[in-house]
Amino acid sequence: MVYSWFCVDHVGYESNPRNRELGFHKIFDRYVELKNSKKSSSDGIHFHYHPMPFSRSAHHCATKYFGSSDTLYQSLARKIIDRSWFPCAFRPGFNAIRPDSHWFLEQFIPFDFSNQAHISDTDLAPDLSSGRFGDWRRAQKNWQPYHPDHNDYQLQGNCKRLIMRCLNIGTRHRLLTQTDVDQAFLEAESKKPVVLSFTHHDFRDMRPDIELVRKMLINAKEKFPKVRFKYSEARNAVREALAINYEPAIKLNLNIRENKLFVDSSVPTFGPQPFLAIKTNN
């Protein structure tokens, strides 16, 4: 199988009772090292972000991206400056997108694995009901990527980025089932562009749950023998499903003229403005 590692920076917290790995690049560097090994060379490295809770505790959840901290900008800016890296794919912390994160992603990141629309949303525990952590009640419950609406990320619209459905394994809600996998194969049999994706967390032993998914794929393949599928990392999965052409690498030219910074691009950029990172002397 091929894996996509969505790496988070645990930074800016005042308490860390569960001893999470703190610091910029700590998790990112670990998985880059693994990817560079022969066994994981086909894996993908992508971006994950946990909004800062009011408590500033590393084990608490939050959904608001701006106002409580600048860790989102810090994390991305340091990836550019320290690692010469910027993401093209994203999965949101706590599966939650809101208008603030929706419009931020629309400027900079084209592939968004956040849609968790699921039949079980009508029967969630009280702490997860009413879209508390990830409101996907109006979103499409199929496996085709979609462009969201400007004012409602759950509906199809004319935004540039693509949102993919990505269900859970190994947890207590929005679980990927055999029915979901069969649905993906049925859609593929109907010649629809399908990206079947699921998510887990590396602080657990993921192997039993991933083996369960593999068995579900085998079962679906027996039901739909004409459907071909392949394991793929996140970026390539979207590109291949939608037949998105590979573009040449962007080349930027920076100049300072009359105390003004000018940035020229060799190709059109994804969003309306570039993400500019600056490192100061202090």
How does the language model describe each region?
Residues 1-38:
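Active-site beta->alpha N-cap acidic-glycine motif
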Residues 81-85, 91-192:
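Active-site-adjacent pocket scaffolds in enzyme catalytic domains
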Residues 113-114, 180-184, 190-260:
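C-terminal domain-boundary segment and adjacent tail
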Residues 244-282:
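C-terminal beta-sandwich/jelly-roll accessory domains of carbohydrate-active enzymes
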Residues 26-38, 44, 68-72, 76, ...:
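Acidic, His- and aromatic-enriched active-site or binding-groove loops in soluble protein domains
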